Amino acid sequence: MNNAKVRIYDLSKELNLENRDILDICERLNVAAKSHSSTISESDAERIKAAAEKFTPQQPKKPRVASRPESKEDKSDPKQQKILAIHHKQEKSGGPSPARPTPPPRPKLQAPKAPTPPQPPVAKASAPKIQKQEEPAQEAPKSVAPPTQPLAPPPVPSLQSPPSKPAPPTPPAKKAAPAPRLAGPPGRTASPNKTAVPAPAKPKVNRPEIVSLKDNRGQARSPGDREEKVAIAAPEPPKPKVELRRPKPPRPEEDENLPELLEFPPLSRGKGVDGDNDADDGDLLSTEKPKPKLKRPTPPRLGKPDQWEDDEDEKANKAKAANKGKRRPKMDDDDDDLDIDGDNGPKPTLVSLSIARPPKPKSLAAKPSTPTVAKVKKPTLKSEAGSSAGGSSRSRGDRRDRKEVVQKPEVIMLDRSLTVRDLADLLKISETDIIKRLFLKGVAVQITQTLDEETARMVAESFEVAVETPERVAAAAKTTEMLDEADLDNLVRRPPVVTIMGHVDHGKTTLLDSIRKTKVAQGEAGGITQHIGAYHVEVEHNDKTEQIVFLDTPGHEAFTAMRARGAKVTDIAILVVAADDGVQPQTKEAISHAKAAGVPLIVAINKVDKPEANPDRIKQELSELGLLAEEWGGDTIMVPVSALNGDNLDGLLEMILLVSEVEELVANPNRQAKGTVIEANLDRTRGPVATLLIQNGTLRVGDAIVVGAVYGKIRAMIDDRGDKVEEASPSFAVEILGLGDVPAAGDEFEVFTNEKDARLQAEARAMEDRQTRLQQAMSSRKVTLSSISAQAQEGELKELNIILKADVQGSLGAILGSLEQLPQGEVQIRVLLASPGEVTETDVDLAAASGAIIIGFNTTLASGARQAADQEGVDIREYDIIYKLLDDIQGAMEGLLDPEEIESSLGTAEVRAVFPVGRGNIAGCYVQSGKIIRNRNLRVRRGDQVLFEGNIDSLKRIKEDVREVNAGYECGIGCSKFNDWKEGDIIEAYEMTMKRRTLAT
């Protein structure tokens, strides 16, 4: 021992003693040592060595020898002895069933409570162990497997047995003599027989397992258990060993190793394996003689048990830190092995020791018994449940498959673009099937990619599912009924809402100005209307003042949505047609909007004061569109007017009022307001502003309103003449302030009495709108990732980034719709931002980062925006007429196109002579047309065959080099790469020029 500190287990190896013996000596010498891994000083080690010389010859050698015959591990020895003692007691109690093995050991155990008698039974028990050890030693795993298998099949009986088994330990505790202890556990008679036979085989296989199990239970065991283990080891050797057992108090230190064995036997008893009983009994009877064989090989195994003990002690320390429950499943198997080993050990001594610790085994045995039984059951249940669950899951999957096949729809409705996942859900098939089907057709898609209606239809039809497309609802169709059943009792007449529609420059706004006696048209940029105007007019009719609300819609083709929106909310439509221009495309569109909205139509033939006016031609053209004038036998009212001179305006107003009376226009003013957004914009000083048309109810300042997905509380209302009003009745249009955001034109609004409900409704709608926008954005992308990469490699991918700011929401939608109509095959338009309001510095920053141009329509620049744009080099274009805006954007797109290289002919010449010069030849030519220019391209033709294409390297007239030769002159043409000139050849001179391409080409 050269080290300053010496470990207990090193000392035990040096002295050839067991760790527990060294610990006993330490305790007697008052040396502080808790476990085999504890360290002591060299002086203490010398004291222990001196004491060990007196102490060791009896205890350490004998327990080791005993452990060797019973099991190859020392740990198994004490376990076997204790178990044997307990099992013998059980054998006595349970003698009737296993009569053969039990009677011989019983008298020996009872009479010699002293250690001497236990030795003969040990020999008998060990004999059967020898047979099993010899046979299963070769097939150790097999011997282990059979006990575990029987445990699994009878989980229920095992549950019943454990409760009875914990009870028996109590009676042995009460009895002081070892014999009564044997009588105590009678219910375990079956298990002792089993354990006695398998004990020899299991110690070999389970030694490592027993170690781990001991470690787990050794932590919870009490010092009494250690005493029992020591007692077990002593009885097997001669009587002096029993005398050594007297120092039981010091043995509590051995608890770490020994108590584990004691705990396991009760647990195993509780488990009791019925299947092993009969076989074990037979083995015991037949194999009593081979015990000496087992004892003989034990001496060479001395080294191994020490190592095993050390390992067990180390594992025990680790087990203390770990959770006991985790290793309990292993303990179940080890418990059975321990029971088997215990049958062979000296039962009387074990019984006496176990009696001293009865209360602890109860709690310990009771607690582990339940988990052990449960653990035995759990694997079986899990395996059974797993198989059953697997079968059930498979059956469920089969059912699902069957259901899917059965539920596969025969017809589906496609009204929009769908993602692959949505289409799969609709068709009740797997997404991978759709992806495979498209891949086979040469279309590579992802599960989240959006498919257009045509592709979705193709996929559905390929799966033999019919596709139906719902009827398209016209944009002008009225989809919402503003009147409720509750309004029927409070209905009153309301003014008619009249929408003026027609082709651009046919005089719509001028007609309205004449009626209102205002000058609106003069204020319009370019003299054309570019957003809806709402005005109310008071008219004298039948000695009463009647009110009419007019909506003026744009006539330009870009404002189709505005015209549809106007027709949707109108009661009467006035179609203005210029008498000198006739029916135009927007005239036809206005007629279709009026028919879709189902509103009566009045035709105002304008500009009848012009000399070239021809009202009859207008009536003829309208009749071809299904509008037959009343004077021609039809039902369409046609009124000739002159907006500029005010001719026959009264007749037009009278017809409007007559039609409104026939239509019976009513509303309930005594309810919360409902209506439609005519226009919306972002004002730099007032914030979001919306023009609302009240179609039912009364709108008041302070109302909580939800416009589409926008919530707001009305702060102010302004009528068409700029005056503030406190309330607005049905059919009136007002501007409101106080919205949280700019709503979309055409959205319907509703007033709520509770602000909380209004906010919740707005949030829900905002979420729906967001999903719709995302889907539209995905479906509207004309460039996919695959096409982008392909075009980028070919240098064909070009994009024009635009930031669009407009005065009102309606104009914004019109411009975006017009941009979509532009050809975008080679140049894509990317609208990074489109919003109403003025151009801000934030817009400039976005444009600078993305290389976009800013387009402002009827809007202004915020303070600092112009300076920021100049600093960042951002181009800001301002427009007030949509024609110019669209033309400039188209020009910008064409500017991104690569110019086209075309061939431009210069002239032709005929070869009339060939002159050899040096190594080559010179063609003497006569210029027939155009001119020949040096360093331009030429093409040599001989008959219908092209012989050569190259450059004109030299051009001479007479002997002087010239740059060009005009028609009618002779010249010499030389080409370094062509000398095969012949008279009669035709030389064509041309050059390649770059021409700007257009979007159409």
Swiss-Prot record:
Keywords: Cytoplasm, GTP-binding, Initiation factor, Nucleotide-binding, Protein biosynthesis. CDD domains: IF2_eIF5B, IF2_mtIF2_II, mtIF2_IVc. Residues 332-342 have a biased composition (Acidic residues). GO terms for molecular function: GTP binding; GTPase activity; translation initiation factor activity. GTP binds at residues 502-509, 552-556, 606-609. Residues 642-644 are annotated as: G5. One of its GO terms (biological process) is translational initiation. Residues 67-80, 212-230, 238-252, 395-404 have a biased composition (Basic and acidic residues). It is found in: Cytoplasm. Residues 34-404 are annotated as: Disordered. Its main location: cytoplasm. Residues 552-555 are annotated as: G3. The keyword Transcription regulation does not apply. PROSITE patterns: G_TR_2, IF2. One of the essential components for the initiation of protein synthesis. Protects formylmethionyl-tRNA from spontaneous hydrolysis and promotes its binding to the 30S ribosomal subunits. Also involved in the hydrolysis of GTP during the formation of the 70S ribosomal complex. HAMAP family: IF_2_B (MF_00100_B). Belongs to the TRAFAC class translation factor GTPase superfamily. Classic translation factor GTPase family. IF-2 subfamily. This is Translation initiation factor IF-2. It comes from Synechocystis sp. (strain ATCC 27184 / PCC 6803 / Kazusa).
